[in-house]
């Protein structure tokens, strides 16, 4: 994951996970 999805996942999971993003270092990234 190298492209940030503009969402953090410190308190809640990535909502952008439906678009293929995943949590890494408290930030959502697109793999």
Swiss-Prot record:
Q: Which SUPFAM superfamilies match?
A: Cyclotides (SSF57038)
Signal sequence region = none
Q: How is it modified after translation?
A: This is a cyclic peptide.
Record-level GO BP terms: cytolysis in another organism; defense response
Q: Where is this cross-link: Cyclopeptide (Gly-Asp)?
A: 1-31
UniProt keyword list: Disulfide bond, Knottin, Plant defense
Q: What is this protein called?
A: Cyclotide hyen-J
Annotated organism of origin: Pigea enneasperma (Spade flower)
């Amino acid at each position: 994951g190298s492209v940030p999805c503009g969402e953090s996942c410190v308190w809640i999971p990535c909502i952008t996970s439906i678009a293929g993003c995943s949590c890494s270092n408290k930030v959502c990234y697109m793999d």
